[in-house]
Amino acid sequence: TRNYVEAIRAVLPGGDVITVRRGSSMARGRDFDLVTESGRHITGRLPSYTVPKVKSAAGYYIDENMDLIDLFIGAEGTLGVITEIELKLVKAPAMRIGTVAFLQDRQSALVLVRALRKEALPEGTSPLPVLPLSIEYFDRRALALLKDQQQSNPAFSQLQPLPDGTPEAVYAEFDGADDDKAWEILSGLGTLVERSGGNEHDTWVALDGQKMEKLRFFRHACPECVNIQVDRCRKSDPRITKLGTDMSVPAQYLDPALDMYEKDLTDAGLNFVIFGHIGQNHLHVNVIPRSIEEYDKAKALYMGWARTVSAWGGSVAAEHGIGKLKVPFLRAMYSDSQLEEMAALKAVFDADGLLCAGNIFSSSPDSDMVSAVSASPASGADADTEEKESLI
């Protein structure tokens, strides 16, 4: 997302306003100097940590000599209130192709995913002429949940009939450009599906707006089905909430991550589905707890996964940020000293901790370092020019 943000205007806690345009304000190594519209200089030092080389929205984005507009993007409102934003638009594809391929098992689905990403090809096949615009994955439990809702809930009646058995699904969208390119993509995709263990004749294809809407309904129906199930469970115990991961891993850990999720959840006897943005190694594991005991058991598993994913070089929050509920996950990803650096960065912009209390950092003064940082500015920066960083 950040690559499409060209400029922002933000109001800081003291009332100062700052405008940052991409390419106009750069860090010098880890040091930065921003100038507000009133002429005040905001200076400080960026944290020393390195962000993981995966899709991530966990804490502040930090890099050597970085464009300082990226500090504010994904900062969860902890540095300033963004009042204006300028975006870069891209031309819509002339022909968008939507597809859903059904595979016999997870390994077959991963073979197709890697072929679509041009990482590894089944024997005797060629890569597609273009990379997909998106690749999504749905495990057999997710499809079973969809099928159950399709049969019992009129709201899901527009779903196309799902195949019999317990297949897995890979959804992909492409820029077809024109009829010739669309045919080349679909012909090649059919071969890849067959060589990955699927049947090209079972594959759903959409080439027009109406059919694309049906495929997109399928793509987005699974989270809604999970919400319906969780709402039913909440009637017996209102403490139960939806439990869904937002973790991403480096490509080489995609298989181990899926193995870990399935083994741990199956051994624990929990009801779950797995779906999400497999093109970026970013899957959502959703547990549907039937009791508060299962809810607590799932939360403990999630914490363990956060530690493992972090050790692999992944992110505990790939797209939804840390917020307030995932603060413990951030502690699994970064050390106390790195969190202190984040807090110092926030204090440069918000010395009194007025913005989004509890986001990224705990709002409890004895469980986080925010109050200490506010009272003791980082070295080399004035008390009113320190900022802290956020991951939730």
Task: Name each model feature, range by range.
Residues T1-P122, A372-P377, D382-I392:
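FAD-binding subdomain of flavoenzyme oxidoreductases
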Residues N286-E293, L325, F329-M333:
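Conserved PLP-binding active-site segment of the aspartate aminotransferase-like
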Residues A206, V230, G321, A357-F361:
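Short coil/turn segments at secondary-structure boundaries
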